[in-house]
Design a protein with these regions (language model features):
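Conserved class I S-adenosyl-L-methionine
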Residues: 6-12, 108-139
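A conserved beta-strand element that flanks and buttresses the S-adenosyl-L-methionine
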Residues: 81
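A short glycine-rich, Lys/Arg-flanked "PGG" loop and its adjoining helix->strand segment in the class I
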Residues: 93-105
Length: 233
Protein backbone atom coordinates (compact mmCIF):
# COMPACT_ATOMS: atom_id res chain seq x y z
CA UNK A 1 0.00 0.00 0.00
CA UNK A 2 1.42 3.37 -1.03
CA UNK A 3 1.23 5.62 2.05
CA UNK A 4 2.77 8.82 0.68
CA UNK A 5 0.41 11.71 1.35
CA UNK A 6 -2.27 9.39 2.75
CA UNK A 7 -4.09 9.80 6.04
CA UNK A 8 -3.25 6.79 8.22
CA UNK A 9 -4.95 5.67 11.43
CA UNK A 10 -3.30 3.02 13.60
CA UNK A 11 -5.75 1.36 16.00
CA UNK A 12 -3.95 0.09 19.09
CA UNK A 13 -0.67 1.87 18.37
CA UNK A 14 1.13 0.26 21.33
CA UNK A 15 4.82 1.10 21.21
CA UNK A 16 4.27 2.94 17.93
CA UNK A 17 6.25 0.92 15.39
CA UNK A 18 3.55 0.88 12.69
CA UNK A 19 2.68 4.52 13.38
CA UNK A 20 6.26 5.72 12.98
CA UNK A 21 7.02 3.51 9.98
CA UNK A 22 3.94 4.91 8.23
CA UNK A 23 5.16 8.43 9.02
CA UNK A 24 8.56 7.56 7.52
CA UNK A 25 6.74 6.45 4.35
CA UNK A 26 5.10 9.85 4.02
CA UNK A 27 1.70 9.27 5.63
CA UNK A 28 -0.15 11.79 7.77
CA UNK A 29 -0.43 9.61 10.84
CA UNK A 30 -2.81 9.40 13.79
CA UNK A 31 -3.07 6.70 16.42
CA UNK A 32 -5.58 5.53 18.99
CA UNK A 33 -5.06 3.20 21.92
CA UNK A 34 -7.08 2.16 24.95
CA UNK A 35 -4.06 2.30 27.29
CA UNK A 36 -2.60 5.71 28.18
CA UNK A 37 0.61 3.99 29.35
CA UNK A 38 1.44 3.35 25.70
CA UNK A 39 2.04 7.07 25.20
CA UNK A 40 5.30 6.65 27.12
CA UNK A 41 6.21 3.61 25.01
CA UNK A 42 5.49 5.60 21.85
CA UNK A 43 7.67 8.45 23.07
CA UNK A 44 10.56 6.01 23.63
CA UNK A 45 10.16 4.52 20.17
CA UNK A 46 9.95 7.99 18.63
CA UNK A 47 13.29 8.85 20.23
CA UNK A 48 14.87 5.70 18.76
CA UNK A 49 13.51 6.53 15.29
CA UNK A 50 14.71 10.12 15.62
CA UNK A 51 11.30 11.51 14.70
CA UNK A 52 11.07 15.15 15.79
CA UNK A 53 7.30 15.55 15.98
CA UNK A 54 5.16 13.36 18.22
CA UNK A 55 2.40 11.71 16.16
CA UNK A 56 -1.17 12.77 16.87
CA UNK A 57 -2.74 10.33 19.32
CA UNK A 58 -6.03 9.82 21.12
CA UNK A 59 -6.73 7.54 24.07
CA UNK A 60 -9.99 5.61 23.94
CA UNK A 61 -11.71 2.39 22.96
CA UNK A 62 -12.71 1.40 19.44
CA UNK A 63 -15.94 0.14 21.06
CA UNK A 64 -16.81 3.52 22.63
CA UNK A 65 -19.53 5.23 20.55
CA UNK A 66 -18.74 8.73 21.84
CA UNK A 67 -15.04 8.22 21.11
CA UNK A 68 -15.83 6.99 17.59
CA UNK A 69 -18.02 10.02 16.93
CA UNK A 70 -15.15 12.26 18.01
CA UNK A 71 -12.85 10.57 15.50
CA UNK A 72 -15.46 10.58 12.70
CA UNK A 73 -16.06 14.33 13.09
CA UNK A 74 -12.47 14.86 12.00
CA UNK A 75 -12.98 12.81 8.85
CA UNK A 76 -12.33 9.28 7.69
CA UNK A 77 -8.96 7.85 6.69
CA UNK A 78 -7.28 6.62 3.53
CA UNK A 79 -5.74 3.75 5.50
CA UNK A 80 -6.96 2.19 8.75
CA UNK A 81 -4.52 -0.27 10.30
CA UNK A 82 -5.52 -2.64 13.13
CA UNK A 83 -2.84 -5.28 13.50
CA UNK A 84 -3.48 -7.98 16.07
CA UNK A 85 -5.57 -5.81 18.39
CA UNK A 86 -9.29 -6.11 17.62
CA UNK A 87 -9.43 -9.68 18.97
CA UNK A 88 -8.46 -8.30 22.40
CA UNK A 89 -11.33 -5.82 22.72
CA UNK A 90 -14.00 -8.14 24.13
CA UNK A 91 -16.30 -7.72 21.10
CA UNK A 92 -14.22 -8.47 18.03
CA UNK A 93 -16.99 -8.39 15.44
CA UNK A 94 -18.22 -4.98 16.59
CA UNK A 95 -14.63 -3.73 16.76
CA UNK A 96 -14.09 -4.83 13.14
CA UNK A 97 -17.26 -3.02 12.06
CA UNK A 98 -16.26 0.14 13.91
CA UNK A 99 -12.73 0.12 12.51
CA UNK A 100 -13.98 -0.47 8.96
CA UNK A 101 -16.39 2.43 9.38
CA UNK A 102 -13.46 4.83 9.69
CA UNK A 103 -12.21 4.08 6.14
CA UNK A 104 -12.87 6.49 3.26
CA UNK A 105 -14.43 5.29 0.01
CA UNK A 106 -11.56 3.87 -2.00
CA UNK A 107 -9.50 3.58 1.18
CA UNK A 108 -7.74 0.57 2.66
CA UNK A 109 -8.48 -1.46 5.78
CA UNK A 110 -5.59 -3.61 7.02
CA UNK A 111 -6.13 -6.04 9.88
CA UNK A 112 -4.78 -9.20 11.47
CA UNK A 113 -7.07 -11.41 13.57
CA UNK A 114 -6.61 -14.68 15.44
CA UNK A 115 -7.64 -17.72 13.43
CA UNK A 116 -10.31 -20.14 14.66
CA UNK A 117 -8.87 -23.59 15.49
CA UNK A 118 -10.14 -26.58 17.49
CA UNK A 119 -7.74 -25.58 20.29
CA UNK A 120 -8.95 -21.96 20.44
CA UNK A 121 -11.57 -22.56 23.20
CA UNK A 122 -8.92 -24.37 25.26
CA UNK A 123 -6.55 -21.43 24.94
CA UNK A 124 -9.35 -19.09 25.95
CA UNK A 125 -9.73 -20.98 29.25
CA UNK A 126 -5.97 -20.97 29.79
CA UNK A 127 -5.73 -17.24 29.13
CA UNK A 128 -8.64 -16.45 31.44
CA UNK A 129 -7.06 -18.62 34.16
CA UNK A 130 -3.74 -16.82 33.74
CA UNK A 131 -5.40 -13.42 34.07
CA UNK A 132 -7.20 -14.40 37.28
CA UNK A 133 -4.20 -16.12 38.89
CA UNK A 134 -1.69 -14.79 41.45
CA UNK A 135 1.82 -14.00 40.23
CA UNK A 136 3.29 -17.32 41.37
CA UNK A 137 0.75 -19.33 39.38
CA UNK A 138 1.25 -17.11 36.34
CA UNK A 139 4.97 -17.91 36.39
CA UNK A 140 4.16 -21.61 36.73
CA UNK A 141 1.87 -21.46 33.69
CA UNK A 142 4.62 -19.85 31.63
CA UNK A 143 7.06 -22.58 32.71
CA UNK A 144 4.54 -25.25 31.67
CA UNK A 145 3.60 -23.74 28.32
CA UNK A 146 7.01 -22.45 27.20
CA UNK A 147 8.20 -25.89 25.94
CA UNK A 148 4.73 -26.69 24.55
CA UNK A 149 4.62 -23.53 22.45
CA UNK A 150 8.30 -23.85 21.51
CA UNK A 151 7.83 -27.41 20.21
CA UNK A 152 4.54 -26.69 18.44
CA UNK A 153 5.96 -23.68 16.62
CA UNK A 154 9.07 -25.61 15.59
CA UNK A 155 7.01 -28.50 14.22
CA UNK A 156 4.41 -26.39 12.40
CA UNK A 157 6.66 -23.72 10.87
CA UNK A 158 9.95 -25.59 10.59
CA UNK A 159 11.66 -22.41 11.80
CA UNK A 160 13.58 -21.84 15.01
CA UNK A 161 11.05 -20.39 17.51
CA UNK A 162 13.50 -17.81 18.84
CA UNK A 163 13.68 -16.22 15.39
CA UNK A 164 10.63 -14.00 15.79
CA UNK A 165 9.25 -11.19 13.62
CA UNK A 166 7.56 -9.34 16.47
CA UNK A 167 10.45 -7.40 17.98
CA UNK A 168 10.42 -9.33 21.27
CA UNK A 169 12.35 -12.37 22.52
CA UNK A 170 10.61 -15.74 22.57
CA UNK A 171 10.04 -15.78 26.34
CA UNK A 172 8.12 -12.50 26.24
CA UNK A 173 6.32 -13.73 23.13
CA UNK A 174 5.06 -16.68 25.22
CA UNK A 175 4.02 -14.36 28.06
CA UNK A 176 2.20 -12.15 25.55
CA UNK A 177 0.37 -15.16 24.10
CA UNK A 178 -0.60 -16.91 27.35
CA UNK A 179 -1.61 -13.62 28.99
CA UNK A 180 -3.44 -12.10 26.02
CA UNK A 181 -7.02 -11.72 27.22
CA UNK A 182 -9.79 -10.89 26.20
CA UNK A 183 -9.24 -13.41 23.43
CA UNK A 184 -11.49 -13.95 20.41
CA UNK A 185 -10.97 -15.67 17.08
CA UNK A 186 -12.62 -16.19 13.71
CA UNK A 187 -12.04 -18.23 10.59
CA UNK A 188 -10.97 -16.41 7.45
CA UNK A 189 -14.38 -16.97 5.83
CA UNK A 190 -16.11 -15.36 8.82
CA UNK A 191 -13.96 -12.24 8.62
CA UNK A 192 -14.41 -11.97 4.86
CA UNK A 193 -18.17 -12.21 5.31
CA UNK A 194 -18.23 -9.52 8.04
CA UNK A 195 -16.13 -7.02 6.13
CA UNK A 196 -17.39 -7.60 2.59
CA UNK A 197 -20.94 -6.97 3.82
CA UNK A 198 -19.73 -3.46 4.68
CA UNK A 199 -18.97 -2.75 0.99
CA UNK A 200 -15.34 -3.84 0.99
CA UNK A 201 -13.45 -6.16 -1.32
CA UNK A 202 -10.49 -8.27 -0.20
CA UNK A 203 -7.30 -7.35 -2.04
CA UNK A 204 -4.88 -9.62 -0.18
CA UNK A 205 -5.11 -12.46 2.31
CA UNK A 206 -2.41 -14.44 4.07
CA UNK A 207 -3.33 -17.41 6.22
CA UNK A 208 -1.91 -17.78 9.71
CA UNK A 209 1.50 -19.47 9.77
CA UNK A 210 0.48 -21.40 12.88
CA UNK A 211 -3.10 -22.66 13.46
CA UNK A 212 -3.93 -20.22 16.26
CA UNK A 213 -1.98 -17.33 14.77
CA UNK A 214 -3.30 -14.33 12.89
CA UNK A 215 -4.90 -14.35 9.47
CA UNK A 216 -3.89 -11.17 7.63
CA UNK A 217 -6.23 -9.14 5.43
CA UNK A 218 -6.08 -6.09 3.16
CA UNK A 219 -9.49 -4.72 2.13
CA UNK A 220 -10.55 -1.83 -0.11
CA UNK A 221 -13.66 0.25 0.58
CA UNK A 222 -16.07 0.29 -2.35
CA UNK A 223 -18.76 2.78 -3.21
CA UNK A 224 -22.08 1.76 -1.61
CA UNK A 225 -24.32 -0.26 -3.88
CA UNK A 226 -27.47 1.63 -4.92
CA UNK A 227 -30.63 0.28 -3.33
CA UNK A 228 -33.33 -1.25 -5.54
CA UNK A 229 -35.74 1.56 -4.65
CA UNK A 230 -33.25 4.21 -5.80
CA UNK A 231 -32.41 2.38 -9.02
CA UNK A 232 -36.08 2.41 -10.05
CA UNK A 233 -36.39 6.20 -9.70
Amino acid sequence: VDLAGKSFLDIGFGQGLALLLAAEMGAEVSGIDNDAANLKALESTRAVFGVETMPRTLIGSILDKDFLQKIAREGRYDVVHAWGVLHHTGDMQQAVRNAAGLVKEGGTFICALYNRHWSSPVWKVIKRTYLRSPQALRKALIVVFYPVIYSAKRIVTGAHPTQTERGMDFYHDVVDWVGGYPYEYAGAAEVLRWVCRLDFECLRFRAARVPTGCNEFVFRKLRPRPSLSNSKN
